[in-house]
Amino acid sequence: MQDDESSQIFMGPEGDQLPLVEMGSCKPEASDQWDCVLVADLQTLKIQKHAQKQLQFLENLESNGFHFKMLKDQKKVFFGIRADSDVIDKYRTLLMNPEDSGSRDEQSFNIATTRIRIVSFVVNNKLKPGDTFEDLVKDGVFETMFLLHKGEQNLKNIWARWRNMFEPQPIDEIREYFGEKVALYFTWLGWYTYMLVPAAVVGLIVFLSGFALFDSSQISKEICSANDIFMCPLGDHSHRYLRLSEMCTFAKLTHLFDNEGTVLFAIFMALWATVFLEIWKRKRAHEVQSWKLYEWDEEEEEMALELINSPHYKLKDHRHSYLSSTIILILSLFMICLMIGMAHVLVVYRVLAGALFSSLVKQQVTTAVVVTGAVVHYIIIVIMTKVNKYVALKLCKFEESGTFSEQERKFTVKFFILQFFAHFSSLIYIAFILGRINGHPGKSTRLAGLWKLEECHLSGCMMDLFIQMAIIMGLKQTLSNCVEYLCPLLAHKWRLMWASKHGHMSKDPELKEWQRNYYMNPINTFSLFDEFMEMMIQYGFTTIFVAAFPLAPLLALFSNLVEIRLDAIKMVRLQRRLVPRKAKDIGTWLQVLETIGVLAVIANGMVIAFTSEFIPRVVYKYHYGPCRTNRTFTDDCLTNYVNHSLSVFYTKHFNDHSRMEGQENVTVCRYRDYRNEHDYNLSEQFWFILAIRLTFVILFEHFALCIKLIAAWFVPDVPQKVKNEVLQEKYDRIRHRMRFSSRSTDV
């Protein structure tokens, strides 16, 4: 047993002295030499069972080459841990070819982050059953574990400040402090934000171009002057005939984002998404090559950590169980059906809300239903996010994947699929189903035979889709960001105030520093994962259905400028330190981005074809309108389009005609559809336009996908400079081995 400076003592329940662990020959260490701190309640030292478990766990760590130090305050006991230099040397040796004195691993070696990564891995992955740190936390032996912030002051000054919002990010310093995985996240986020600038500018131009035609649009003119056209009531909440001219303002607003520029913008965004990903691949290759990680192997890294943790570690064979895969598939499909069911819940809400609002806001019932429906959808998203994460975790545990990286990939796929349906199921309903299964006036489809299904706004379904996207995206970018920042900030301030008020803050500099880290907000495995997921969903809103909401890239740009600094402030000032992890790419998220890009092409093509009025306008202009027969027609080719696009319904065929308010002399009302006047069946014109819609979708998707493929081929994933550097490194290693081999032969 060493002197009191180099050892600490547990006190048993009867005052018995239990040796904690000898510090060996090491002298007391400075605060910045301790990487990880375990925390336990002070009362656990008086419980023999817990004290023995703590001692056993720490002795297990000591046998792996770790050193410890214990400090106490009035309530807690802190165990500082650091790895011995022999552990670092072992790690370096495992990842290097001993013949390559200048290997890429040595060049990319960062002792501080490596030591932290090793300590964190070993503490969390002791192999003895019932002896893992997670088990000890559940048993109350330990409370938590955290990594110490140290040397972060420069990042606070130049990065984690709101006033630095428009300053470049210090990626190299982020990498040295948080590791390559976090550095790649901020590199990707910064590049994504930069690339949003052209998309936001083009989207704004498309939106503003609608203002240029705000009053001059032929369709708007016809709607605003149609005082003699009465529209049939939309639902049970409306019992009067609206003059078409009352829709004048909404018709003009709809034209802001439902015009010819929308098609060009959708094609532009398909090209933008491809160029963004291709140039990102090049930027990623350049960054990881500068870090000497281009050929780094994640599986080798994990195996090296496992061997440091236990020299007797054995590889787990890859196994595939068709039974478990089938069960997981069925459960996943069930959850997807549940997400789709959420859309049906919203349908029911909107129908019932229409009946409720009819007595409160008679003039704007449809708008009120759309707005409140979007808010309800946002609340459902918040709730289902927690449910989806729990379900995805359970599915991954049931699957029993091997390495951590493999588990992370499978969890990412499952969680994203569930989140995608949670966020976009309602938008899919509004874009492609709303107003298309309602029947016609006098014979409407009803929910449970009582309530008439809602219909699109009289100005078109694009207005409903625009409002839904604007509200959901606006709430996610504002309310979610406020909660994401204010909750950790207030929680951190509250912990510090509580500790100071009760006199728990020590005057000892080292213990005070540990306490400062302890009172920061806790982190978990999903801290960085959640940031990525948030950005993936935002990217989906920015590309999918962007034809209906050209301002989405602009909102995303403003949000990301805030998001970068918000995440920086959280990680440096408000949260405990993340485990520095190595990485050479953003992993499965790249495949997620590519999938979203393909879905965006399909969705935007269908929105233009089926949701907007683009195809009916084009068909009328060249097949039914005045320009078809009269090439010298001087007026607008869309003249009389509004009257042509509205079907006729005779009010005498209403079952409840007596309930209509006013306009008793109205014998004919109009509604949005293409139906015959005599029997209300779908007209020949409907089927002709449907054929054109389907043709457009096929042509648009093939054209957009061809552009994506050409752009992907034209822009190489890896710069030639990086290829040459990697090739030179391989050449140098081979030459070095040749010299090494020659020396060995000579001996």
From Swiss-Prot:
The keyword Endoplasmic reticulum applies. The keyword Glycoprotein applies. The lineage of its organism: Eukaryota, Metazoa, Chordata, Craniata, Vertebrata. The chain crosses the membrane at residues 194-214, 260-280, 327-347, 365-385, 415-435, 544-564, 596-616, 696-716. It comes from Mus musculus. It is a multi-pass membrane protein. The gene is Ano9. It catalyses: a 1,2-diacyl-sn-glycero-3-phospho-L-serine(in) = a 1,2-diacyl-sn-glycero-3-phospho-L-serine(out); a beta-D-galactosyl-(1<->1')-N-acylsphing-4-enine(out) = a beta-D-galactosyl-(1<->1')-N-acylsphing-4-enine(in); a 1,2-diacyl-sn-glycero-3-phosphocholine(in) = a 1,2-diacyl-sn-glycero-3-phosphocholine(out); Ca(2+)(in) = Ca(2+)(out). Keywords: Cell membrane, Endoplasmic reticulum, Glycoprotein, Lipid metabolism, Lipid transport, Membrane, Phosphoprotein, Transmembrane, Transmembrane helix, Transport. Coiled coil: none annotated. The term 'anoctamin' was coined because these channels are anion selective and have eight (OCT) transmembrane segments. There is some dissatisfaction in the field with the Ano nomenclature because it is not certain that all the members of this family are anion channels or have the 8-transmembrane topology. Phosphorylation on Ser-245 by cAMP-dependent protein kinase A (PKA)is essential for activation of its cation channel activity. This is Anoctamin-9. The modification Phosphoserine is found at S245. It is found in: Cell membrane; Endoplasmic reticulum. Glycans are attached at N630, N643, N665, N681. Belongs to the anoctamin family. GO terms for biological process: calcium activated galactosylceramide scrambling; calcium activated phosphatidylcholine scrambling; calcium activated phosphatidylserine scrambling; establishment of localization in cell; lipid metabolic process; sensory perception of smell. GO terms for cellular component: endoplasmic reticulum; plasma membrane.
